[in-house]
Amino acid sequence: MSEPKAIDPKLSTTDRVVKAVPFPPSHRLTAKEVFDNDGKPRVDILKAHLMKEGRLEESVALRIITEGASILRQEKNLLDIDAPVTVCGDIHGQFFDLMKLFEVGGSPANTRYLFLGDYVDRGYFSIECVLYLWALKILYPKTLFLLRGNHECRHLTEYFTFKQECKIKYSERVYDACMDAFDCLPLAALMNQQFLCVHGGLSPEINTLDDIRKLDRFKEPPAYGPMCDILWSDPLEDFGNEKTQEHFTHNTVRGCSYFYSYPAVCEFLQHNNLLSILRAHEAQDAGYRMYRKSQTTGFPSLITIFSAPNYLDVYNNKAAVLKYENNVMNIRQFNCSPHPYWLPNFMDVFTWSLPFVGEKVTEMLVNVLNICSDDELGSEEDGFDGATAAARKEVIRNKIRAIGKMARVFSVLREESESVLTLKGLTPTGMLPSGVLSGGKQTLQSATVEAIEADEAIKGFSPQHKITSFEEAKGLDRINERMPPRRDAMPSDANLNSINKALTSETNGTDSNGSNSSNIQ
């Protein structure tokens, strides 16, 4: 019979258990490592370090952000960009997919790029996207261009994840520097004198390209007006087959700005001698969407590009970039890349494990308190009169019930932690409805977003349900597409009606019959 194997005294409790997952580098890159002798960033070193989840010294991060901002500040509201060019849509903090984008679209060293905004929020690697793109902007200021998206603002980054990410990975100083840099981003680009490129779309207050050039962009985007519309507006869902002749209608999905119609786009294109509008702002199952062709040019009047594959890790969509060269437009699609895992909302492992500890502690407390029987309680209270003794006994019972209720809450948190996080992720505040945890497992499983936002209910949703389609994911995430509440006043319906009447009186009565196009001829 063999002797039991002795425990290796050299076994370290600090060694990484799963060695296949490398530990992020603890060393933060210095200015000497990131910048060469000419002050230009070494983007290859930066890329390799960021892909390992490495970080920079705070002063280095601030230098990249501020130097990039100084270049952006010198650019015009409306950029003039020549072909060939590769146009990219939303990134949303998906840094590892951004690296795949550059593989598909071509190296920034010899490829002209135009990004349409939304570099941050929702994904867990937003600051990496900003640092890398800003470093590329410093290195290639004349061939890499960045526009502003609706998420490049204080209001949304505080509401969603970017501010929290900056504070966890760097500091609030880095976040504030990013906000100042976002204020410098141009609003639009005129590509090859043929295409207007923006993040969202048109505005009833923008009739010519000069209207864009005249805007004051160096500020936090307002809740309404032309700057807001450029960043927030969307085409109508039935674009090209509208049942109304109105050019602009209130955007009920976003809670701000407008939906614009096919006649509105065609009139704008004809008035400004343009071929099409390129925009981002909306997730697409195929990574892109081409809308109804213009009757005068035969070219799609509107094209949407979305460059974040498997958006939020649940949409299961493809991403795409648009390459335009020699008057030929090609769409290149790509799928998502593996990325490191973060607990939801940047939760640390101690917070994650707290329900397990809490359940056991409360369970022990309940067991200790339940050792005392009713007879023992009665014998200890012989010195009190009947009313006082009964009151004391009821107080003790209530305390036991309260701890028992707390034990149930921790039990639910432990058993249903994934369900809790799923539900929190579907609410704009990241908070659960009151009473869900104390109601137990059944209450949690039947909880819906309707309990949090009645007007945006997703009826019948259960965390155990697996999302199986792009449309289902988009529907569940719909509440997060809205502009968060803010104090700015919105224009009245009367103003909107007067705008539409003026536009309708000027239109040439464009025929609204036709079908959407998915190919360019």
Swiss-Prot record:
It is an enzyme of class 3 (hydrolase). Residues 494-503 have a biased composition (Polar residues). The gene is PPP3CA. Residues 392-406 are annotated as: Calmodulin-binding. This is Protein phosphatase 3 catalytic subunit alpha. The modification Phosphoserine is found at residues 469, 492. It is found in: Cytoplasm; Cell membrane; Cell membrane, Sarcolemma; Cytoplasm, Myofibril, Sarcomere, Z line. It comes from the Eukaryota. Its cofactor is Fe(3+); Zn(2+). Residues 407-414 are annotated as: Autoinhibitory segment. It is a peripheral membrane protein. Residues 504-521 have a biased composition (Low complexity). Residues 56-340 are annotated as: Catalytic. It comes from Homo sapiens. A motif (SAPNY motif) lies at residues 307-311. Residues 475-521 are annotated as: Disordered. Its EC number is 3.1.3.16. The record marks 352 as: Interaction with PxVP motif in substrate. PROSITE patterns: SER_THR_PHOSPHATASE (PS00125).
